[in-house]
From Swiss-Prot:
<comment type="subunit">
    <text>Interacts with ttr-52.</text>
</comment>
<keyword id="KW-0217">Developmental protein</keyword>
<keyword id="KW-0445">Lipid transport</keyword>
<dbReference type="GO" id="GO:0005576">
    <property type="term" value="C:extracellular region"/>
</dbReference>
<dbReference type="InterPro" id="IPR001124">
    <property type="entry name" value="Lipid-bd_serum_glycop_C"/>
</dbReference>
<dbReference type="GO" id="GO:0006869">
    <property type="term" value="P:lipid transport"/>
</dbReference>
<dbReference type="GO" id="GO:0005615">
    <property type="term" value="C:extracellular space"/>
</dbReference>
<feature type="signal peptide">
    <location>
        <begin position="1"/>
        <end position="20"/>
    </location>
</feature>
<dbReference type="GO" id="GO:0001786">
    <property type="term" value="F:phosphatidylserine binding"/>
</dbReference>
<dbReference type="InterPro" id="IPR017943">
    <property type="entry name" value="Bactericidal_perm-incr_a/b_dom"/>
</dbReference>
<dbReference type="GO" id="GO:1901076">
    <property type="term" value="P:positive regulation of engulfment of apoptotic cell"/>
</dbReference>
<keyword id="KW-0446">Lipid-binding</keyword>
<keyword id="KW-0813">Transport</keyword>
<dbReference type="InterPro" id="IPR017942">
    <property type="entry name" value="Lipid-bd_serum_glycop_N"/>
</dbReference>
<keyword id="KW-1015">Disulfide bond</keyword>
<protein>
    <recommendedName>
        <fullName>Nose resistant to fluoxetine protein 5</fullName>
    </recommendedName>
</protein>
<keyword id="KW-0732">Signal</keyword>
Amino acid sequence: MSRNFHIFFLLVSIIQVGNSADSSEITHKPAGIYVRLNQKAVDYVADLASDALPAILNNLSPPDIVTDMAKITKLHISNVAKPNLSAKFIDGKGVAYNISLASFRASAYAEISVFVWSYEGDFTAELRELSIESELHFDYNGTTTVNASVCNVTHSELSLVFPPGSSLSALQSEIKGQIVSALRDAVCTTAVEALTFVMAQKPIPPESPNYQKPEAGDPNGFSVAELGASLCQVDTVNGFEDSEQEEGNVETTVAPTPDDDNSTLTTEETQKSYWGVDLSVNHPPTFTDEDMIIGLDGGILFNGWKADSAQQLQILNKTRLDKKMVGILLSEYIPNTLFHHIYMYDLGNFKHRYTPSSLPKILQKLSKAVCSKCYVEVSANLTEQPILQIDAHLGARVQLSGNVSIMFHGREQLHDVLHANTKLHVTLKPTVRHSRIFGDVSLTNVDVNVFDLGLGGPLAAPIEKLFSFVVPRVLWPQVKKRLRFAMNRRGVKLPIFCGVELEHTELDFVDHAVLLNTDFSFDLPLFLAKFKKYLDAKSKINPNLPKYVII
């Protein structure tokens, strides 16, 4: 009896542990996009950073530093050796990293006030054999907290050199202490505070009293987004450097207005509207010895509003994010949030106007029969919210419903020729044949089913019969055949996007999501050239930005 009781107790304990593990997983909110990084990706990024830091820091002259007690000017960084960087995932905890730097030199001019005494002069600080060892642990209990459980900053030598007779030499020990303290704070405190801040970010709904509309940044300030855009720009146009675009003088295109001759684009979106992405960390970082997975909401925001009709899925198959340096699982939730805004705010409505001389061939004969001197207005609007569904076997299917009308406008008459209520199911299932350089994209399945097609107007009956026969039975099969032949024969080259080249890419489908597993490489020389050119252009108009000075 006692033996049976112990067996029963053991089984109950195992079940409770299992339920506890399940419940801890359920406490994480579902996410729209999951990203997995493996150790290979971290090692590659660490190697890139090791090469990049000396190139970025050497000969850099940061802006002046002004505090209540001191003013430091003429800062100049040099003799930055290539550091050794390494990072390793810690199962269930976080990440450990090590940085070792052989040498670092900075020169400056300082003015320091202590009570009634003033000290000023040039000095040079040289740091040797700097070593940083740290562990960042991520803990989740309703909210994510980050702490540096291990943080050691050591150096073999910190020397200060002053000109003969400099009054600053009297403060040598205090200056050394400030430098070491600033290093330790940057590594042990600032990084933790920054990560904790990022983990806690949530979008504030517009109805909240704390809501603030995003303001445009300083056009003369340093912008990561602007730097990224410059990284994506083409350097040359017809063999000549496009320097104006590189410096941000980009020519903009004005949207069509109702006075344009050929077209009118009507939409409820105004110039004051803005888009955003919900970057809430719904699934906090989880770690094994081999990888890290993080989940972001990823939903599209319009004027700060979330898409209420798009629902996050509780269960997504994340186990297949296990093949390459980076794995991305993109839920159907994200495009459906975009479709929600497009439909709710009438952003999918448009009108296009043709003059008699600019009519497409398909409408020229119809124009001669109805009104040869009229201009033609084609309009369309969505009648239902588009819905995207992803199936592991079928691919991604978009359901579109809308009204289409064609009207001929004369001086005295309006000819209402055509109204169509149409529903389309567009199914796409691309695959990627991984190639080291490009990777071919194959459009393996394209199926469109047209149903509920009703037409009005004087030519409704003959046109409806023509569309009912030609579109599904004649036109679409030929288009589909040509598409499949072209895509499968030649493929579409994956571009090198902003210096990032995808390699050995694999694209798969699971229920409700798309999986992308890929290796990647990064064009570091391109980034360094763009970074220095961008900073040089910005520093000429903003004295508060760093600049490169060769001494």
